[in-house]
C-alpha cells in the first residue's frame, strides 16, 4: 500500500473476509527486517481500515526471533490492540538462507503459549501462537470465530 489511501479503500470496498497486514516485527528492528517499510504506517493502515469499515475483521502477524526484547514484543501487541486489530499471529523466524538475517532467539512452546494467553488477555479476538504459525495459519477458522464473537456481542447488546 505504501500509504496509499486509494489502494486501501479499493481493498476495503471489495469487502474481504479479513484484511491482513503484518507488522512483522517491533519498531526498533523495523528498518533492518522490513527495509522501505514504516511501523507507524503499518499501524495507521490497520486503523484507517477500521474507520472505513468498522465491521471489517483485521489481522496482523509478528515473527519473533530477530532479537526483540520480551517487553518490546508486548508493546507491539499492545500497539496492534490500540488500532483495534482483531486477530494476531505469532510465529518463529526461520532463516531461509545465509543471505538473510540470523536467528537471534528460538522461542519455546511455553513462551508461545504465554504470548497467546497475554494476547487473549489484551483483547484480541483470536491469537495463533507457535513456532510454525504464519499469517495464513487456519485463516478460515479465525475469520469464522471472530464473526461468531462479534455476532454474539451484538446479540448481547440487543438483549440489554
Short names for language-model regions:
Residues 13-14, 37-57, 62-160:
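Auxiliary Fe-S-binding modules of radical SAM enzymes
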Residues 26-27, 134:
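Alpha-helix N-cap/helix-start and coil->helix boundary motif
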Residues 24-26, 93:
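Short, acidic/turn-prone active-site loops that include or flank metal/cofactor-
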Residues 4, 29, 33-43:
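Active-site-adjacent beta->alpha loops and helix N-cap segments on the catalytic face
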Amino acid at each position: 500500500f505504501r500509504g496509499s489511501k486509494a489502494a486501501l479503500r479499493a481493498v476495503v470496498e471489495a469487502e474481504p473476509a479479513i484484511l491482513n497486514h503484518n507488522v512483522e516485527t517491533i519498531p526498533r528492528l523495523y528498518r533492518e527486517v522490513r527495509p522501505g517499510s514504516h511501523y507507524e504506517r503499518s499501524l495507521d493502515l490497520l486503523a484507517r481500515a477500521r474507520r472505513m469499515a468498522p465491521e471489517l475483521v483485521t489481522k496482523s502477524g509478528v515473527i519473533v526471533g530477530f532479537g526483540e526484547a520480551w517487553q518490546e514484543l508486548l508493546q507491539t501487541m499492545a500497539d496492534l490492540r490500540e488500532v483495534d486489530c482483531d486477530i494476531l499471529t505469532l510465529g518463529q523466524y526461520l532463516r531461509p538462507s545465509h543471505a538473510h538475517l540470523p536467528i537471534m532467539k528460538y522461542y519455546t512452546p511455553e513462551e508461545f503459549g504465554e504470548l497467546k494467553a497475554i494476547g487473549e488477555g489484551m483483547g484480541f479476538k483470536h491469537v495463533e501462537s507457535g513456532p510454525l504459525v504464519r499469517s495464513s495459519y487456519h485463516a478460515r477458522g479465525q475469520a469464522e470465530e471472530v464473526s461468531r464473537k462479534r455476532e454474539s456481542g451484538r446479540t448481547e447488546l440487543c438483549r440489554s
